[in-house]
Design a protein with these regions (language model features):
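Long helical/loop segments within the catalytic core of UDP-sugar-dependent glycosyltransferases
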Residues: 84, 88-96, 100, 104, ...
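Acidic donor-binding segment of Leloir-type glycosyltransferases
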Residues: 44-91
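Acidic donor-binding/catalytic loop of UDP-sugar-dependent glycosyltransferases
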Residues: 118-133
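Short aromatic/hydrophobic "clamp" motif used to bind/position activated sugar donors
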Residues: 113
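Catalytic donor/gating beta->alpha subdomain of glycosyltransferases that bind UDP-sugars
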Residues: 140-142, 146-165, 194, 199-250
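Active-site acidic Asp-centered loop
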Residues: 62, 116-119, 144
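N-terminal membrane-anchoring/stem segments of glycan-assembly enzymes
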Residues: 1-20, 172
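Cell-envelope/extracellular polymer assembly enzymes that use nucleotide-activated donors
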Residues: 24-27, 56
Length: 250
């Protein structure tokens, strides 16, 4: 146990050799699958307020509400970092998360991209800065996302379960045997993505943070960002029943 997990507390990504001499501009890609005003009003501002000089936020809206999309696009008047794109929702042709990410990647203006979800909340304004710094030492960057702290035993079990699940793949990553990340907090370059011909099985709603990552991760191209200032917390939408439904992604 100590041999496998004991390296996590002392791991420092800055021991790895640099491949860039400065932090790159970054595109933050966020797929949005509903008319989620709580994301727009509460969590999006935390992304836009990141303490980083050169970044954009690419929001891929999957839906059919033209008024909502116009409100979303209008935000660019106040926040020039925002780029929006829309995929028209058609019940006959379901749109997977990987399809939305594929559109977001093609819409991104920068080579280095960080991916998150509408449910994830940055814990500090240094999150993006630290994730971007990871690209100086690897073309793939993985970070941690916990579960928001709330009252109750169910929430305690959720937070503990997330920590244990994440410790398994983080331990392998710091040993230079990375095999996955978390869909709420990871990144890679366009060169990595298009060099691997993108996601496979675009119609499947799983695999972007594990199956794809297994194809492109090597011993030398992964940066692991473990600073508490670079963590996110996932918003919960229910109790243990909701949590068990989320475990299918692990």
């Amino acid at each position: 146990y100590i041999f496998v997990y004991g390296r996590i507390p002392g791991y420092k990504n800055n021991r790895r050799p640099q491949t860039m001499d400065r932090e790159p501009p970054v595109s933050v890609v966020v797929p949005l699958f509903s008319e989620d005003y709580s994301f727009v009003e509460e969590r999006l501002p935390l992304i836009l307020a990141q303490n980083y000089p050169d970044f954009e936020v690419v929001i891929v809206y999957v839906g059919h509400d033209s008024d909502f999309y116009e409100d979303l696009a209008r935000l660019k008047q106040s926040f020039t970092q925002i780029t929006t794109t829309k995929i028209q929702l058609d019940p006959r042709f379901p749109i997977s998360r990987k399809m939305a990410l594929n559109v977001g990647i093609k819409s991104a203006h920068y080579e280095c991209m960080v991916f998150t979800s509408t449910d994830a909340v940055p814990q500090t304004d240094r999150w993006l800065s630290l994730m971007a710094k990871g690209f100086m030492r690897g073309e793939i960057v993985v970070g941690y996302c916990g579960v928001e702290r709330r009252k109750g035993f169910a929430n305690y079990m959720m937070r503990t379960g997330r920590m244990m699940q994440s410790a398994a793949w983080i331990a392998r990553a710091v040993q230079r045997r990375a095999y996955r990340g978390t869909l709420h907090n990871y990144g890679f370059t366009k060169r990595i993505y298009f060099g691997a011909n993108g996601f496979s099985h675009l119609n499947m709603n799983i695999g972007e943070d594990d199956l794809f990552m297994q194809r492109v991760m090597t011993r030398d191209n992964v940066s692991v960002i473990l600073s508490p200032r670079a963590t996110l917390r996932e918003k919960t939408w229910g109790g243990m029943g909701w949590w068990m439904s989320q475990l299918r992604y692990y």
